[in-house]
Amino acid sequence: MPITVPRTIKYAFLSITKEALSNIIKHSNATAVSILMREHPALWQLVIQDNGTLQSPSATEGIGLENMKERIRKLNGTITFSCENGFSIFIAIPKNKKEESDL
């Protein structure tokens, strides 16, 4: 059965994925990228990981990452970044009835 994702979540995940891929190209020497979206009973999850290294410390402080944080905050979600074994973005957005009415 296909998963029906609320528009607000789709838009946020698409925008964040595009920004993450742009950052990987600009700031990493990655040779592989993994993008995983999951539906859990209580939340939506997006995980983006690469196997590269940061070319500059400022790569973790840019406007793109701030925009990601703001987008997820507006959806009452959480976003974390990790620089271990490449760069990773972990996002969780709780499901709620209002979002499901946006389908």
What do the PLM-derived regions correspond to, one by one?
Residues 1-18:
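Conserved short strand/loop->alpha-helix "switch" segment adjacent to the catalytic nucleotide/phosphoryl-transfer site
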Residues 21-28:
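Short helix-loop "hinge" at the ATP-lid/N-box region of the Bergerat-fold HATPase_c
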Residues 32-42:
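Short beta-strand/loop element within the Bergerat-fold HATPase_c
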Residues 37-39, 81, 91:
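Conserved catalytic core of two-component histidine kinases
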Residues 57-87:
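ATP phosphate-binding glycine-rich loop and adjacent ATP-lid/helix-beta elements
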